[in-house]
C-alpha cells in the first residue's frame, strides 16, 4: 500500500508474481503476491538511452517500457522509447537489447539489424513473438528459433488505413496491443477503433470488432452501450473463446465472444 507507479501500461502474471511495465517511471517492477511487496528489477526512474549489451538491471536506465511477455527464463520488454525489444533475465538480473538496432523504421532481418518503430505490444506463441509496431502501423513476427524479424502486416511510417484482405494488402493504423493463439493473431488496432484478426494459416486480415465510421463514446449508464463501437482500444487478451479488450477512451473493459460474435461490457462482479 506504499508503493507507487507512474502510468504503467503492461502487466504480466507469472506464478505468484506480477511484472509491471512502469512506463513513465522507465522501470520494470515486480509485485510479489505472497509477501505483498513491490520492487524494481530494472530502471532507476530516469529515461535511458541505447545500450549495446546486457547490464545489471538496477544500474540500467530504460525508456518507456510498454508491454511484457515471458518465455524461458526471460521477461521480454517492448521498449517503445528505444524502438527495440529488450530481455530481462530472471536469474541473473541483467537486462539489455534482444531485437532491434535502435533506429526507427520497418526493416526485417537478423535480430541486431532489424528496425522497429515504437513497439508497444508483444505476445508469444510457440517459437514466435508478435509485436505491435505502432508508428509503422505494423505487426512484426520474431522467429525465436532462427533469430530473425519478419513483417506480417504493414509497410512503413506513412502507410496506414483500415483495409481487410491478404496480408500484403491489409492496413492497420497505430496498433498498440497484440495477442496470439496458434495461427491466430488478435490486434488492438487503436486508431481504427477496432480489433483485427490476422489469420496466418489463410494469410488474411479481417475485422472482428469495430468499423471505421464508429467512433461514438460509450456511456456505461446507457443500456445500449454494448452496441456502440470501441474508442481507441489499447490492448487485447485471448482466453478460450473470449477476447478481453482494453477499451481505453471509453474507460471500459469489453468482452467479445468469438463464437457468438457478441460484444459486451465487463461487469464489475465478473
Describe each region flagged by the PLM.
Residues 15-16, 72-73, 126-127, 182-183, ...:
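Short coil/turn segments that connect the beta-strands within blades of beta-propeller domains
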Residues 20-24, 77-81, 131-135, 187-191, ...:
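Conserved beta-strand positions in repeat-built beta-propeller and related beta-rich domains
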Residues 26-29, 37, 83-86, 137-140, ...:
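A short loop-to-beta-strand structural motif that recurs across blades of beta-propeller domains
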Residues 237-270:
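Blade-level signature of beta-propeller repeat domains, shared across WD40, Kelch, NHL, RCC1
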Residues 1-9, 37-64, 94-118, 148-176, ...:
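Gly/Pro-rich loop segments of beta-rich domains
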Residues 32-36, 89-93, 143-147, 199-203, ...:
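Short loop/turn segments that connect beta-strands within beta-propeller blades
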Amino acid at each position: 500500500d506504499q508503493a507507487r507507479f507512474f502510468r504503467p501500461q503492461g502487466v504480466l502474471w507469472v506464478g505468484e508474481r506480477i511484472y509491471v511495465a512502469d512506463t513513465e517511471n522507465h522501470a520494470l517492477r515486480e509485485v510479489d503476491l505472497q509477501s505483498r511487496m513491490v520492487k524494481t528489477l530494472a530502471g532507476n526512474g530516469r529515461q535511458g538511452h541505447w545500450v549495446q549489451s546486457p547490464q545489471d538491471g538496477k544500474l540500467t536506465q530504460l525508456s518507456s517500457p510498454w508491454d511484457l511477455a515471458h518465455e524461458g527464463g526471460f521477461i521480454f520488454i517492448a521498449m517503445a522509447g528505444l524502438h527495440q525489444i529488450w530481455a530481462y533475465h530472471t536469474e541473473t538480473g541483467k537486462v539489455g537489447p534482444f531485437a532491434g538496432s535502435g533506429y526507427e523504421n520497418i526493416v526485417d532481418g537478423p535480430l541486431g539489424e532489424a528496425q522497429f518503430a515504437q513497439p508497444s505490444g508483444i505476445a508469444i506463441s510457440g517459437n514466435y513473438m508478435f509485436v505491435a509496431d505502432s508508428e509503422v502501423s505494423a505487426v512484426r513476427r520474431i522467429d525465436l528459433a532462427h533469430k530473425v524479424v519478419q513483417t506480417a502486416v504493414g509497410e512503413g511510417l506513412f502507410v496506414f488505413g483500415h483495409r481487410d484482405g491478404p496480408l500484403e494488402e491489409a492496413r492497420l493504423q497505430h496498433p498498440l496491443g497484440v495477442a496470439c493463439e496458434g495461427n491466430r493473431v488478435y490486434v488492438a488496432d487503436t486508431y481504427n477503433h477496432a480489433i483485427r484478426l490476422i489469420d496466418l494459416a489463410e494469410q488474411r486480415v479481417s475485422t472482428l470488432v469495430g468499423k471505421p465510421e464508429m467512433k461514438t463514446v460509450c456511456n456505461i449508464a446507457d443500456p445500449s452501450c454494448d452496441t456502440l463501437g470501441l474508442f481507441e482500444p489499447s490492448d487485447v487478451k485471448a482466453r478460450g473463446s473470449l477476447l478481453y479488450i482494453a477499451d481505453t477512451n471509453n474507460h471500459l473493459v469489453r468482452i467479445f465472444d468469438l463464437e457468438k460474435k457478441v460484444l459486451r461490457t465487463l461487469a464489475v462482479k465478473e
